[in-house]
């Protein structure tokens, strides 16, 4: 089933956190619909800002929105004018106070959503699909990906019959739940019809427990800097006891 299911949803609660973090109770449906409106609005409003992921957290009177983007400057604007304007627009949608956090993606070549969107924009610009895909694969492998798989579907090169073509390099173990696999789907509207682009990127395997909290800065620091003492630090404890006895 690893080949059929969405790799992101298959790893929720294991190595991947949720994009919506709140308790809705009886208003679950209304809150979920509002989340969908927020994401649709932000994706349309920030179409050129290379937005990868939008995480929404809710408190009683506050909505915290974390936007993961490769171009934070386009969202923040000069002296923060654009992000303040965006905050006021979101307040009208949610009818609550809104806090916006911007998280910069430092390696967009390893982000499936950004890679898929870039390929889609190139296909709309009449660039050959094989060239666009091979450039994306080369960039991802150069930036340290363990493997990447890209599927392009539709009327490729204007053919009368639609077909799918797959490009692979490296390893993408979809059945291995500890494998950190990012997945995204994008669509390109061309003169011959709609083309679909699916991207799978394997960034390695996660062996230690990962913090699934939506606070990206905390999760990033914890994953990069594990506890210096470690789980088995008998020598250090013994030295501290000797110093205390003296």
Swiss-Prot record:
Region annotation Disordered: where it falls in the sequence: 218-246
Function: Binds the lower part of the 30S subunit head. Binds mRNA in the 70S ribosome, positioning it for translation.
Residue span, KH type-2 domain: 38-106
MF-aspect GO terms: mRNA binding; rRNA binding; structural constituent of ribosome
Protein name per the record: Small ribosomal subunit protein uS3
PROSITE patterns linked to this entry: KH_TYPE_2, RIBOSOMAL_S3
GO cellular component, one term: cytosolic small ribosomal subunit
Quaternary data: Part of the 30S ribosomal subunit. Forms a tight complex with proteins S10 and S14.
Gene3D superfamilies linked to this entry: 3.30.300.20, Ribosomal protein S3, C-terminal domain (3.30.1140.32)
Annotated gene: rpsC
Recorded family membership: Belongs to the universal ribosomal protein uS3 family.
UniProt source species: Porphyromonas gingivalis (strain ATCC BAA-308 / W83)
Keywords on record: Ribonucleoprotein, Ribosomal protein, RNA-binding, rRNA-binding
One GO term (biological process): translation
């Amino acid at each position: 089933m690893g080949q059929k299911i969405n790799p992101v949803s298959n790893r929720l609660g294991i190595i991947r956190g949720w994009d919506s973090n709140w308790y809705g109770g009886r208003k679950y449906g209304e809150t979920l619909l509002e989340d969908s409106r927020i994401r649709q609005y932000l994706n349309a409003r920030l179409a050129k800002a290379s937005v990868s992921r939008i995480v929404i957290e809710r408190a009683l009177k506050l909505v915290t929105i974390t936007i993961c983007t490769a171009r934070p400057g386009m969202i923040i604007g000069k002296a923060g004018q654009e992000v303040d304007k965006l905050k006021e627009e979101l307040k009208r949608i949610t009818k609550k106070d809104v806090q916006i956090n911007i998280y910069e993606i430092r390696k967009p070549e390893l982000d499936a959503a950004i890679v898929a969107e870039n390929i889609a924009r190139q296909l709309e610009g009449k660039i050959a699909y094989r060239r666009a895909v091979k450039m994306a694969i080369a960039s991802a492998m150069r930036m340290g990906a363990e493997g990447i798989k890209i599927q392009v579907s539709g009327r490729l090169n204007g053919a009368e019959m639609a077909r799918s073509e797959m490009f692979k390099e490296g390893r993408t173990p979809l059945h291995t739940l500890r494998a950190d696999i990012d997945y995204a789907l994008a669509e390109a509207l061309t003169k011959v019809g709609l083309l679909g682009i699916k991207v799978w990127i394997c960034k390695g395997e996660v062996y230690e427990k990962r913090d699934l909290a939506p606070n990206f800065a905390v999760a990033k620091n914890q994953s990069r800097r594990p506890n210096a003492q470690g789980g088995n630090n008998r020598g250090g404890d013994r030295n501290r006891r000797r110093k205390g006895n003296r």
